[in-house]
Amino acid sequence: APALVVTATTNCCGYTGPACHPCLCTQTC
């Protein structure tokens, strides 16, 4: 799986849960 896709952990959007769209850490999802 692509490294930017994170599941069931603190994702790039700063919340715990399933990964959002592989966004940049500076963007809101």
Swiss-Prot record:
Q: How is it modified after translation?
A: O-linked glycans consist of Hex4-HexNAc2 hexasaccharides. N-terminus is found to be free and N-acetylated, depending on the fraction studied.
Location in or out of the cell:
Secreted
> Which keywords belong to this entry?
Acetylation, Amidation, Disulfide bond, Glycoprotein, Hydroxylation, Ion channel impairing toxin, Neurotoxin, Secreted, Toxin
One GO cellular component this record assigns the protein to is: extracellular region
Q: What glycosylation sites does the entry record?
A: T7, T9
Q: What Gene Ontology molecular-function terms does this entry list?
A: ion channel regulator activity; toxin activity
- Where in this protein does the record say N-acetylalanine is found? A1
Q: Which residues carry this modification: 4-hydroxyproline?
A: P2, P18, P22
Domain remark text: The cysteine framework is IV (CC-C-C-C-C).
What's this protein's name? Conotoxin SIVC
The organism of origin for this protein = Conus striatus (Striated cone)
